[in-house]
Amino acid sequence: MKTFLKVVIFSVAVILFYAFYANEMIPQVKPAPPPVEAKLDMGSLTMEQFIQMGDTVFHGKGTCELCHNPVGGRAPLLDQVGKVAEERLKDPRYKGKAKTGEEYIRESMVEPSAFVVVGFGVKGTNDAQSPMPVVTSGAIGLKPFEVDAVIAYFQQKAGVTITVQLPKEAPSADDEEKAHVAAPAKSAEEVVNKYGCGACHKIAGQQGALGPDLTKIGAKRNKDYLRRAVIDPNADIAPGFPAGMMPPDFGVKLLAGELEMLVDYMAKSK
Amino acid sequence: MKLSSLVVRETSSGKRRFIVSLFFFVFLFTLPFFKSAEFFPIGTNTVYAAEQAAPAETPSAKEEGKSEAKKEVYPPAPKLTESDYPQVKGINGRIMAWLAAQLHLWFAAFVLAVPIFVFVIEAIGMATKDERYDRMAYEFIKVSLTAYSITAVFGGLLVFTLIVFYPDFLKYMAGIFSPTMLAYAFLFFAESACLYIYYYGWHAMEKGTAKWIHLTIGWMLNVVGTVLMFLANAWVTFMMSPHGVDANGVFEGNMWHVIHNHLWNPINLHRVIANVAYGGSVVGAYAAYKFLSARTSEERAHYDWMGYTANFIAISALLPLPFAGYWLTAEIYAYSQQMGITLMGGVFAWLFIIQAVLIGALFLSANYYLWCGMERSKGAVRYTKYIKYIAFVIVGCFLVWFTPHTLIMTPGELKAIGGPYHKYLGPLGIMPAKNTAVNIMLIFTFLSFMLYRRCNKIATVSWAATGNAIQIAIFAAAIINIAVLGVYYGYFTNTVYKVASSVLQVASTLTVIISCMIIDVLMFKGAKEVAPLQWGKMPDRSQYALFLLAVSFTWLMGLMGFIRSAIRQHWHVYTVFRDNSPDAFTPTIGYATKIVSVGVIIFMAIVIFIFWLGQISAKKSVSEAHH
């Protein structure tokens, strides 16, 4: 019986140590919830909002950034794809059907092997086959208007003329059901979740530790300050935090309503 | 008292096991018939994609009757809503399914692995005519027998849980896999038959031709068990990398295609190796428990030897396991870069830091047990001075493996370190450093084993000095090669070469293990023994290393099982069948590890209870033997 108890105590202690380590010593990152299905008001969409939708799809639902980033080197960077698209059409290796830059970018998303940038093909295929998934099917499942939004985003990013047309008709019921990307957030908590503020800040129940704690920020800062801190984060640096940590583009990412909701929320957090 | 008198004959409990197994078999046998919709009154809100999209029947549709008939037999994956998932007050369906599946898997891994090495040990016993091997093989299989019925119980619980909480999912899977489920049920029956004949016929088939028949039954038991696992693996991997269905999840009619999906073979290999390592560790824990409870030096000697053998099996399988895991991960990337990056670069990345701690614990405890084992030999004094250096290298490698890529820090810490990445420690966080560390750790663990193996021997061959020199040269060359590959290709070239160089690192490690083992076996053939090995002369603390090994293995399996399943994210079947249940979210690491810990506590409680029962029944048997 003594051995039995000793062994039980030892085993439980080991298990509890692992549980403690995983809970207390490892940062608890809250994964994004499954995509929410929401309705989209396409009738009143402006080109700025459409580009914004493309930005959000690129960094969110499209999961493009997983590979097209400067860290991993897994896929070519797309900052200038709006510019180089026309040049690719003249490349002797190009075997697609596109006639314009816009068509080339669309084709590269729905038929990735039409042209593979040198060095980024599937191993052993001599860059004839792309490892990229078709973005309109499978786990990504972008709708045609979302593909167009991403093209508009690329063109705007490269500084070329935006040739994509805004969607003229309301999307089908199925489109509406799935298009969650550009839906404006309905509450400050949704804004926090949508833009991942909690990854760095303590806010709305999230426990980020890289940036200042915002749970009582309203007691110290007024709305003007808070608005500026979102739009131009390097304008004022909180003591003890290095400059340049916060992405500077929330000013163009957040919709006006979302920004105001967030600022109100922070101002009331006392 | 002879050890053979400890053998417990359990006819009444055998009947109970048989009844449980028969019940499970009957249950599994009926499962494929659940394909029929009337078995599933729950989930009436389910809308199948084809039904939703199907227009009213037209003459042309009638003309296409034959092609449509195919779609009627194999419906697309249903589009479920929250209300299609039955709720039972006070019970969370996902946690219930999670724990039932995990407990089933732990016990199943154990009962599939033990017959593999029991077969090998029995064959060694036959070849060497050393009865100790036969006794030990019998005791191993005895331990797994109780676990066999518990495996069946948890398997049944899992199926019931799926019927109650995920009826539409089960219906969809049964719609595709029903022939394999039927085969599974038959094979389960065959496995039970093989196991019971193998175990209960052990003493009746001890001599002559009967022994050969017995060994053949052991071989059949392994074949049937392995095929069983491969079938279950097909279901699991289909959920991760579906094949043989179209984009809507409509089965295209070729059973081999859905079985032979992209991740089937990598998982098959990984699970076979991991099961052996795991089975060895649990049997090692059993031997440790018996060692600690032993009252005579003869018992201590027997269970020391059993623990050593079990640990040897566990470590032998542990060494190639990272390579099988590497292949599996590479295939996940090859199937879907998204899934691969979710696994290694997304929210799951931190789980690999926990994995590093666990594998570090496995390696350290295994090495510690080997070092303690040197006390059995008087010749070990020649090598004990090297242990501290080996320990230093292994701990150093563990720390590299353990270094995270990005640290979550307080603002003060962030400022002090100069940004999110430390100047010197930052580079240790990426895979090339970790690949280098794990390969060196494996090589030094192998070195520990080699020292242990030769500590009681003196080579008598004329070329012993040359052999030693060659071995040292192979070790040195491999370590330099691994380090250079890791540093140069890891930091000074692009990603493609980083990945490719890891293959050469693995090849270096395998070269060391295989070539040095061959040289060692030849060099110590006919070697002189320093003194007889003193089995049983082990400190009690060494036995806790075996427990640490078993508990860490169990926890690690639970964690990795969670990751394997969770990288599907909000999909029942990745990309074709979405999970719309209220529990479709990916939990935080803390949440997941709490569930894993609860599962491990339940598992260990049952296992230790089985050991304790074995102790009680053994005492009874001893008492009867004295009478």
PLM region spans:
Chain B
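Coil-to-alpha-helix initiation sites in intrinsically disordered, low-complexity, charged segments
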Residues: 1-2, 41, 90, 254
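Hydrophobic secretory-pathway targeting helix
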Residues: 2-42, 485-489, 557-558
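Intrinsically disordered low-complexity regions specifically enriched for long asparagine
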Residues: 12-21, 43-51, 70-71, 101
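Sec-dependent signal peptide cleavage junction
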Residues: 33, 37-56, 60
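Polytopic transmembrane helical bundles with strong interfacial aromatic enrichment
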Residues: 50-51, 56-627
